[in-house]
Design a protein with these regions (language model features):
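Generic surface-pattern signal
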Residues: 10, 15, 59, 109, ...
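Catalytic binding pocket for nucleotide-activated donors in carbohydrate/polymer assembly enzymes
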Residues: 264-376
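Nucleotide-sugar donor-binding catalytic core of glycosyltransferases
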Residues: 6, 13-283, 297-309
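Boundary detector for helix-to-coil junctions that initiate low-complexity/charged tails
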Residues: 1-7
Length: 377
């Protein structure tokens, strides 16, 4: 597994820094899958599992993977003009409907026979491009969706279920929005792994559980507040609750630190509070899990994701969205170290086993099927 991680990091350096694109091989029997991608860490996290398992795909299903930055595709500067069986593409979340359609048509003109998948890496659960893309794609891939698919037909204040909740909670004036799902779209909607399956987290999950009996920090919660009005008020409320604990608990909540120091703090923390961001699923959720810090987070039971890492009372501690039970649960789990470690260990081992057993290779089969890339057993 370590070799696959280093291959990914070398790939990132070659594509991002050197601007070199590796052509597909000339082996006629191999199928070809091309990822057209945006340049952002969250975007790259969505495709990492595929490139991590690239050799498995070649061996088990006989197809190759290549990555083409979206900017290079738009400029027609790439070596992928030949036949391609599947194209998976990303865009930024604020692309206009007309621009998205133009891009989709360009992909179709370039590879007329390819099956197309859209990779929605966006933080919120909404499916804003479903209706636009439905006639053109074989699959719509996202790292989290609402468990109740019927909720997608409900109008929201703002763009998402989170903007809706916090606009109502804080009395904010946001326009009503509805991203209706086309009939039958649910069959195209597929899940991809969340942030746990990334090159900077995976190595930690492959190590033994980081048990530490004498963690010195009671609560870790470095919370950024600046952002859009609903986000700022939501995060400020969370920060204020954490700051109230400073007089009686040892808390890390103020300012920014580098990644190494940040992880060092988490390895030394009993509890980690991870409020929502612009979406529910956050990097911090899994950083808490691989450091053995017990995750406290607003209730995630409304979401689907895989691996299914948010199991109430088993892999994390759910909080009310208004955080009315925050102080009570902080006090309880600080006073019950055995229960705290049990839940933290469960979370770590659930993800560790997912990676060790290479379950992604099974979970991805519905997507491969839709793209015509699966080799029949």
């Amino acid at each position: 597994m370590k070799t696959a991680i280093w291959r990914w990091r070398l790939h990132r350096a070659v594509v991002d820094r050197l601007g070199l694109l590796r052509p597909f091989s000339q082996r006629g029997a191999r199928k070809r899958c091309l990822f057209i991608t945006e340049r952002d860490a969250i975007c790259q996290a969505q495709i990492f599992p595929f490139f991590f398992h690239a050799r498995d795909f070649a061996r088990q299903h006989g197809f190759e993977l290549r990555e083409l930055p979206l900017s290079r595709f738009l400029e027609d500067r790439h070596p992928y003009g030949g036949a391609v069986e599947a194209v998976c593409f990303q865009t930024w979340f604020d692309l206009s409907p007309d621009a998205l359609l133009e891009l989709t048509h360009k992909i179709r003109r370039t590879w007329p026979e390819a099956k197309i998948a859209y990779f929605d890496w966006f933080a919120p659960t909404d499916l804003r491009y479903a209706a636009i893309l439905d006639p053109h794609i074989a699959a719509y891939v996202k790292k989290q969706t609402l468990r109740d698919i019927g909720q997608y037909d409900r109008p929201t204040l703002g763009d998402t279920n989170l903007t809706d909740y916090y606009a109502r909670r804080f009395g904010l004036d946001l326009p009503e929005t509805r991203f209706a799902l086309p009939a039958g779209f649910e069959g195209k909607l597929l899940l991809s792994p969340h942030f746990a399956f990334t090159d900077h987290m995976l190595p930690y999950f492959l190590k033994p559980f980081p048990r530490r009996e004498n963690r010195s920090l009671d609560l870790h919660a470095r919370i950024a507040v600046k952002g859009t009005p609903w986000y700022s008020q939501m995060r400020q409320e969370a920060f204020d609750l954490v700051a109230k604990q400073e007089g009686r608990l040892k808390v890390a909540c103020r300012g920014r630190v580098g990644r190494d120091e940040y992880f060092k703090e988490l390895f030394d923390s009993k509890l980690c509070f991870s409020p929502f961001g612009y979406g529910e699923v956050c990097w911090r959720d899994f950083e808490a899990m691989f450091t053995g810090s017990l995750l406290l987070k607003p209730d995630m039971s409304h979401l689907n994701g895989y691996p299914e890492a948010f199991i109430p009372g088993e892999t994390y501690v759910p909080l009310a969205w208004d955080l009315s039970d925050f102080e009570e649960k902080v006090a309880y789990y600080l006073a019950h170290p055995d229960e705290r470690e049990r839940i933290a260990r469960n979370a770590f081992e659930l993800l560790q086993q997912y990676f060790q057993h290479r379950r992604f290779l099974e979970d991805v089969l519905p997507l491969l099927r839709r793209l015509g890339l699966e080799t029949a057993p």
